[in-house]
């Protein structure tokens, strides 16, 4: 479906353009941009949110992969000389290069087809971030905020909560977009912890433990983590080896990872970012 700018939404970019003024206003109110903020928008699309933020903060920067959209944005916002467009893939973009005198505030209506790996990429750079506000598939927001025992609880939620406070804000129906997606959406706020509540001795070890556990989420911990820890080691930590991975909280996963870090035993490689 094309729009008044003549741009065809592209499936390969997961494009669904926000057009509902009420939803746009509510999102910007949640972000609460200030003139002095260092704000970066991922995937501005046709500039619906961009326009509202620029009116408050003319130094907004955006990261956009679709080269056909870039001239549309340049033309639309030609009267903002400090507005910067980075033609790049957000999945590999180094956001730390945009940091100047203050941490970044990152916002975006994220393409649903890359939202999970993109969030993992951004979590790895959370040290330079003040907060993040994203429009995501409702299910992804539920996974980000899930607690132990929840069916949505898994690797994404554990690692997001390791780095950030997760605050689901409100839901958005398909009618707010063109073309309308087949799923409901939701807005979430991620605020990196000033101090990690459960700092792991080795982050890669923690990531490997969590990924290994949830690759066998229906099995007991004794079976799911059999290649990494013994029943005796789990019991020494006071962890019931008969529980399933979805019953264990972040603090317990950190304790398992720290035990492995202390013993130097790790049989997994964490160079790859993957989903639950």
UniProtKB/Swiss-Prot annotation:
Catalytic reactions on record: adenosine(1518)/adenosine(1519) in 16S rRNA + 4 S-adenosyl-L-methionine = N(6)-dimethyladenosine(1518)/N(6)-dimethyladenosine(1519) in 16S rRNA + 4 S-adenosyl-L-homocysteine + 4 H(+)
Location(s), subcellular: Cytoplasm
Domain of life: Bacteria
GO molecular function, one term: 16S rRNA (adenine(1518)-N(6)/adenine(1519)-N(6))-dimethyltransferase activity
Disulfide bond recorded as keyword: no
Cellular component GO terms held in the UniProt record: cytosol
Pfam family, one: RrnaAD
Keyword Phosphoprotein part of the UniProt annotation: no
EC number annotated for this UniProt entry: 2.1.1.182
Broad enzyme group: transferase
Gene3D superfamilies the UniProt entry points to: Ribosomal RNA adenine dimethylase-like, domain 2 (1.10.8.100), Vaccinia Virus protein VP39 (3.40.50.150)
Annotated binding of S-adenosyl-L-methionine, by residue: 16, 18, 43, 64, 89, 109
This protein's UniProt keywords: Cytoplasm, Methyltransferase, RNA-binding, rRNA processing, S-adenosyl-L-methionine, Transferase
Family: Belongs to the class I-like SAM-binding methyltransferase superfamily. rRNA adenine N(6)-methyltransferase family. RsmA subfamily.
Described purpose of this protein according to its UniProt entry: Specifically dimethylates two adjacent adenosines (A1518 and A1519) in the loop of a conserved hairpin near the 3'-end of 16S rRNA in the 30S particle. May play a critical role in biogenesis of 30S subunits.
Protein's recorded name: Ribosomal RNA small subunit methyltransferase A
């Amino acid at each position: 479906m094309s729009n008044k700018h003549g741009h065809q939404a592209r499936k390969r970019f997961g494009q669904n353009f926000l057009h509902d003024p009420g939803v746009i206003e509510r999102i910007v109110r949640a972000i609460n941009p200030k003139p002095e903020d260092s704000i970066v928008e991922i995937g501005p699309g046709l500039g619906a949110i961009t326009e509202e933020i620029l009116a408050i903060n003319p130094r907004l920067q955006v990261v956009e992969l679709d080269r056909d959209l870039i001239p549309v944005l340049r033309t639309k916002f030609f009267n903002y000389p400090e507005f910067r467009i980075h033609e790049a893939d957000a999945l590999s973009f180094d956001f730390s290069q945009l940091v100047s005198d203050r941490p970044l505030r990152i916002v975006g209506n994220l393409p649903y087809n890359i939202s999970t790996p993109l969030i993992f990429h951004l979590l790895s750079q959370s040290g330079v971030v003040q907060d993040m506000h994203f429009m995501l598939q409702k299910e992804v927001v539920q996974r980000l905020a899930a607690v132990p025992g929840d069916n949505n609880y898994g690797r994404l939620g554990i690692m997001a909560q390791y780095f950030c406070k997760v605050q689901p804000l409100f839901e958005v129906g398909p009618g707010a977009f063109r073309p309308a997606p087949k799923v409901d959406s939701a807005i979430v706020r991620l605020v990196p912890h000033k101090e990690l509540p459960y700092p792991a001795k080795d982050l890669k070890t923690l990531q490997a433990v969590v990924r290994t556990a949830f690759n066998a989420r229906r099995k007991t911990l004794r079976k799911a983590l059999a290649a990494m820890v013994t029943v005796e080691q789990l019991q020494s930590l006071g962890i019931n080896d008969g529980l399933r991975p979805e019953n264990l909280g972040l603090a317990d996963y950190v304790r398992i990872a720290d035990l492995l870090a202390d013993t130097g035993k790790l049989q997994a490689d964490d160079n790859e970012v993957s989903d639950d």
